[in-house]
Amino acid sequence: MSTSQTLGGATRCGRIIGPSLDKIIKNAAWRKHTYLVSSCKSVLDKLESLPDDFHDPSSVVSGLAASDADSVLQPFLLSLETAYSKVVEPSLDCAFKLFSLSILRGEIQSSKQDSILFKLVNAVSKVGAIAEEPIQLAVLRVLLAAVRSPCILIRGDCLLHVVKTCYNIYLGGLSGTTQICAKSVLAQMMLVIFTRSEEDSLDVSVKTIYVNELLTFTDKSVNEGSSVYFCQGFVNEVMAAGQGSPLPPPDVIQILLQNPETETVMTPDSPSFRGYVANGEGDSETGDMSKVRQDAFLLFKNLCKLSMRFSSKENNDDQIMVRGKTLSLELLKVIIDNGGSVWRTNESFINAVKQYLCLSLLKNSAVSIMSIFQLQCAIFMSLLSKLRSVLKAEIGIFFPMIVLRVLENVLQPSYLQKMTVLNLLDKMSQDPQLMVDIFVNYDCDVESSNILERIVNGLLKTALGPPTGSSTTLSPAQDSTFRNDSVKCLVNLAKAMGNWMDQQLKVNETVWPKGSQVYASMDSNASQISELEGTISDCDSQPDTSNPEAYDASMLEQRRAYKIELQKGISLFNRKPSKGVEFLISTKKIGSSPEEVASFLMKTAGLNGTVIGDYLGERDELPLKVMHAYVDSFNFEKKDFVEAIRFFLRGFRLPGEAQKIDRIMEKFAEHYWKCNPGSFTSADTAYVLAYSVIMLNTDAHNNMVKDKMTKADFVRNNRGIDDGKDLPEEYLGSLYDRVVKEEIRMNSDTLAPQNKQVNGLNKLLGLDGILNLVSWMQPDEKPHGANGRLIRDIQEQFQAKPEKSESVYHTVTDISILRFILEVSWGPMLAAFSVTIDQSDDRLATSLCLQGFRYAVHVTAVMGMQTQRDAFVTSMAKFTNLHCAADMKQKNVDAVKAIITIAIEDGNHLHGSWEHILTCLSRIEHLQLLGEVSPSEKRYVPTKKAEVDDKKALGFPNLKKRGSFQNPSVMAVVRGGSYDSTSLVKSVPKLVTPEQIKSFIANLNLLDQIGNFELNHVYANSQRLNSEAIVSFVKALCKVSMSELQSPTDPRVFSLTKLVETAHYNMNRIRLVWSRIWNVLSDFFVSVGLSENLSVAIFVMDSLRQLSMKFLEREELANYHFQHEFLRPFVVVMQKSSSAEIRELIVRCVSQMVLSRVSNVKSGWKNVFTVFTTAALDERKNIVLLAFETIEKIVRDHFHCIIETEITVYADCIRCLITFTNSKFEGDIGFNTIEFLRFCALKLEEGGLVLNEKLKNNTISALKEDFSDTQSFTDLDEQVSYWIPLLTGLCKQVSDPRPAIRKRSIEVLFHILMDHGHLFTRPFWTGIFSSIILPVFNNIRSKTDMLFEESVDSPSSASLDTEETTWDVETSTLALQLLVDLLVKFFRSVRSQLPSVVSIIVGFIKSPFQGSTGSGISVLLHLADGLARSASEDEWREIFLALKEAASLTFAGFMKVLRTMDDIEDVETLSGQSVNIGDLDDDSLHIMSYVVSRTKKHIDVLSQIVEVVSDLYRRNQFSLSASHVDILADIFSCIASHAQQLNTDTVLRRKFKRACSVQNLTEPQLLNFENEAYKSYMMFLQDMVTCNPNVSKELDLESRLVTECAKIVKIYLKCTDPQQQEQQQRKPVLWVLPMESDRVEEATARTSLLVSSLEALCSLEAESLKKHVSSFFPLLVDLVRTEHCSPQVPYVLSNVLKSCIGPILA
């Protein structure tokens, strides 16, 4: 025989088989195994002769022909059949190699039992029964290698047999190592088989099982030290042995995977493995699946059936059965854990899970073995993770059965079961999508239980522990474990929601903008919800899932709202059924018909069966109809009577009231007899029998009934009930037996628990409302065992669910769903975290709770749920215990750290919660400050000396001082208070004790864990907050700072300092955001700046200065107003502060800022000038002087910076300067300010000249001459507009009450106009006159007019010559002179204003005030001289018409004055007698004096008007046109006529004489006035006729002259001819002047006028005289016969007659 190196020949298989055969030959017993040895030798010889490259696809052995394959493997079959371990081992080793190296190939199944491979696998399986560990391990190796081989396909029953072999090795293993290896091999086989089914391929990559995971639930006791490591290496070796072996040709694989239609997967004659499972149903379940999937399906189904085996009654404690059940469940778990998409897409696999695995879980739910329960939970978790999308209905049923039943049992739970459930929930809570899907598909499903809500409430109950006073089986350690684990689950749930939310936001970051505003509550869809009318089934309409987002956003919310309202109705029904039905009908949850209400009662889950029974038994109309409809809905046809009753009563419990039972059972009997008319004689029989059955049921199953009813008693009680006849005794006995054996009862009882737990902490945290929702007693649920009726009911539910659209599984990615989840879970989370952290000092428990708080705040904050977010943050802030530092513990410090972490991580979404966080930071700093100066403490981080000084200056106590702890503010901190109380207690009833002080100081050590870095990090991190968050942060910080500063005894500036720092940190934000921030800061600085605490106010204003200096470093672009905003607090505080120190500080701050950053100031100028304007009116002189010094520097040195900005800034500057002129402090400020205004004008002119230099083809002279309407001059107009504020300000100063200021203002105003008017355009000049110049004179005119009106209305007290009026006249005269100079200088530009100026001058002329007339005349003459060559004819006409109007208005005003003397009695004077003064009262005397004075002034005014008219005529007589002359003639004429009117009023003259005589006054010269007026008129006419005959002829002035001469002669004749005197009746006179003397005096006065008129006639030409001789000749005759007082009259008269009349007559 050849050596071992050459055994087997050159073929690949030969090299493997040869050594094994040689070893068999050596180990075999020659006598006993002769045939085996000879067979081995024969094969060895054959192998050595075979070629190496032979290929036969039909052969099962690679490299051999099909005919040789069987003979080569035959020795191994013989060796295995010997069961002799020495020859079995080499055979198994060779088989392992052949399978591992893919030498063997082909399909192995029971239908091909002649196949050598089938025989080989079967033989290997048989030797597994050998009770030797090496043999069993070798068998496991071979079977695993066969299953793993990509060239071998073990099918059907053969595969089951392989599994059974490993199964039996596990059950009968001699050692723990063997058992673990068997389990590991089985698990690895499951991976191989089901991985192939996933990919539908033989050659797949399969992961190696992890042995330690298989020992999680079972077999921990059989682990023998290094067994796990050995088994892991064992499996690894088998799996690695086949790697690298060549693959079979594709045609071989195709043959193996082919699934002929005629091939049968399962055969009736299955091996003994079928003893463990039921017979298969055939291949109808597998359909057209491939072979590998058919095998996987078969294996899965049989494993499920194996897991449903239960112990027999004879052997309840069958350990083998239990281990087999457990192993099958473990293998099912491995399969589900490693399942892929095929389980969610292949209907056969889905149905297999539903029909077999779910049934297995259902039947095992009542098993009390812990390992099985744990495996159930693990499989259930796998189903949730992998297959929840296809098992919606099943999961909805298993949740209460497996999880909630245990979770909600608080009082008497099984420790291990509950720990298993808590571990399951812990895993679930770590899968965010799973929790979301549970909520969406169950809590939002009308047909499903609120699973997530029950989970969180169950976790809350567990976290709170058993209620106080209740009995429990838990030890304190177990209870503590439950509490911690339940809290951990809630923490993980909050974390999972946050992670899911963050993930969705990251995925949809292009769709969802950041910020909590995204998660604002969705619009209500009430109109859509209202469509969900009718019964619950109406909700089962299939939603449109073509648009998932639409479903998520709208339909989900509708369904959730619908379910909540439905549950509200169900809850109301369980308390008050009638109101509940009424509510459900009104909200359209059910229809109003009895049939619909009955259907609702029958089908709706959650209704209390007892309440249903009570409602159905009511005798009211609707409940009675509903009861009838309820009963009629049952179909009792061909139903046994007891089963009918049982079926009828499964939905409700019969009421306790006999009448209600009677009504219900009467209707039941009637309906039963109607469905089964042949069952009894009448319905009465059914009624009586039903009543008897109900009583029997109560008697048999009520423990309180001691003497039970016998069958004989029952038969006897029902004699003669069938219409007098007896029912068959056998029938009644059968009824008795069935009722006694199985109780008639409801399917389930839903009793509402009543026990609730409330403690002081709940009240503190406001958790009463949350905890009141928690039921502490476990619902009285029906035991979920493996009884047939329960299984049938659940299977009916399984089958019914898919028919409803609610069974559609929804996967939601819309984060808005988190709002609904949080609404359900936030309350239990808050309660659990709060109660735990308050009651427990365990570091692990409190750390968990704080993590939960962090996660909950994150989710609620990002989702924009303000109420929930604030609740969590507030609770955390309370748990810091900073408000009661004497009781602080480590957990409170941890809470502080958590709050700081929240502030850093979720600052963007905290919004209103920032106030609580910043309050905590403030309190920390307060406590640290106290600790830093306490006797036993040193500073944690050295504070700057300045900072300490500031704090001490603001009232902080020094604890080192003796008795400092009895300081009221320190006592308040030591004694503590509620979270919302202030740190100061105004009245402390007693001193703090040394123990309290010691505890307080000791607790301050805990705060050393929180350094300044942690505190400052929150404020420094503010620069990373988004735009909305930083505004909220600043608002909150302002509130906290305000509360610090408002403390009356220990105000602090910590938050104020941090506010300033925060502003510095965020200074680089965009202006839009900064504007919003500053709106908050501005109001805060104003509030604090107005504080009564001077130190605080100074500190905040200095802080504001620092910020403003920073702001001014940033350049501001044009048309922005940010500087204006951040300087506004200075203005407000300056205007409102009552503290002179603050106002002075503001002035200094603003001065420093402006002068140091003057080039950067833009929009801030407005506030700067507003501050100085306010300072200008301050009561403190030093403030006024300080502000004026600054404004002086600004104007003098930086005027260009002002005019570079917008016009309003310059206007503010001028307004500020004007205000300084109004300062009440006398001195040079006012005058200096006015001079500065003139300086501003010079600066503006410089700006105008610069602009003019830019104009093309224009010069300064051209600008002075005229302005054209080109675009260049548009720019000039804009520049000129800067003059408006300056001129307007000076205009206002004209009305200043101080004469010197007023006069200087007028001078400067007009000097500016004179010096710089060449820059102004005509439109601008028009504006200057209308807005500035004319108002100056209007103001003066209004004053004089007012005084004049007062004097007219009350002449007795009037005085026109007061000092004020005198000054007004002087001022107005000066202004008038300057105005005329201005008009003359710029007449070309302002000639349109000539009428206005003339009107002003005329007003002066006609003014009754002393000196104004003369001033007006001189000014008018100056104007005439200045405009002599410039004014046009029309402009002269305007001047003359104004003079005429002035004269006319003078007449009217004077006549009004004269009417004031109408009430004074008129008496004729008698010569030689005195006047009795006593006849006149004081008012009359004053009136008379006033009128006399006014008459004199009136005469003077008119005389000067005549004079100015004459003067104007003389200066311009040759340039006057006819219209001008006509106006002048009218002026002379009207004045002369007025003078005659006054002089001829004898009554007036007598009154004047009387008044002047009484008061020793000179009489008004009325006569002289008349003579002078006529004389001027005559001279004017005579000169015109003589010198300007053309105009005279055009106006017929000669006729006027003759007429006026005739009038003068008549007047003279009237006073000299007695016959022409009218005789008047007079009253008695006191004294009488002789008439001759009076006439002589008047005639003498009129002589000169008469002579002038006669001479004027003589000057006429002969033709003119001849034409008018007829009119004046009679008057000459009268003059001849009149006695004259002067010889001149006859002389002139004779001359007229001789030289003029004579020639005419001749």
UniProtKB/Swiss-Prot annotation:
The active site is at E657. One of its GO terms (molecular function) is guanyl-nucleotide exchange factor activity. Keywords: Cytoplasm, Guanine-nucleotide releasing factor, Membrane, Protein transport, Transport. One of its GO terms (cellular component) is trans-Golgi network membrane. Residues 555-742 form the SEC7 domain. Inhibited by brefeldin A. The keyword Protein transport applies. InterPro entries: ARM-type_fold, DCB_dom, Mon2/Sec7/BIG1-like_HDS, Mon2/Sec7/BIG1-like_HUS, Mon2_C, Sec7/BIG1-like_C, Sec7_C_sf, Sec7_dom. Transmembrane segments: none annotated. The keyword Transcription does not apply. One of its GO terms (biological process) is protein transport. It is found in: Cytoplasm, Cytosol; Membrane. This is Brefeldin A-inhibited guanine nucleotide-exchange protein 4. The gene is BIG4.
